[in-house]
Amino acid sequence: NLMEAKVAVVGDLELFAEVNAAKEQCPKLEAIVLIDGYEDNKELDYVHSYHELVEKGKELNKEDSTKLDSAIATVTPDSLACLIFTSGTTGKPKGVMISHKNVLWTIESLFGQMIPANKFPRIVSYLPMAHIAARAGDHYQAIYRVGQIFPVPVLEDMRDALPTIKPSVFLAVPRVWERFKGGLQA
């Protein structure tokens, strides 16, 4: 529990089972928000429905939008945008704090010359969201450049997906380029 998170948001029952089993080792964890599968676990007082929380947030914002506006006003370029954990290949995994300024600098320095600001990139996304390359090169890039993201979660499906998607941006780690090369040479 390196993050000491108070809330965990999980997408499905499989991941929920893992997080719920680890809850004892996470003393600061107060709530688990389930995107899918809430009905099966609503008897647990620390489990909440993502969809119900979104609706409650909308209602609260209608009642008093100044709270949200005030919270937004506190965000600065140095504010935390996200935490990304390293893989731990050179030791214990570490949580890396990424600021909004870090995100913008990365997008501009890596892609500023390749993708003009007025272009709307079509981006293939296949890396896990926990991977910094996926966050910066796919998701943040698409948000910043008003682009489109096309997820291809199974790498083996890439060959069939590329002609359909016709990406204008394709970010790849060396292992992926090696697999492409091997496929072309076969």
Across the structure, where does each feature detected by a protein language model lie?
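Short hydrophobic/charged patches on amphipathic alpha-helices used for structural packing
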Residues: N1, D69-I72, R159
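Structural core segment of the AMP-binding/adenylate-forming
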Residues: N1-E55
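Conserved acidic residues
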Residues: K6, E30, D78, P121, ...
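Conserved S/T- and glycine-rich ATP-binding loop of Class I adenylate-forming
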Residues: A8, L80, T86-T89, I123, ...
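Conserved pre-ATP/AMP-binding loop-to-beta segment of ANL
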Residues: H48, E55-F85, K92, P116-R122
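Conserved AMP-binding/adenylation subdomain of ANL enzymes
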Residues: L104-R122, M129-A186
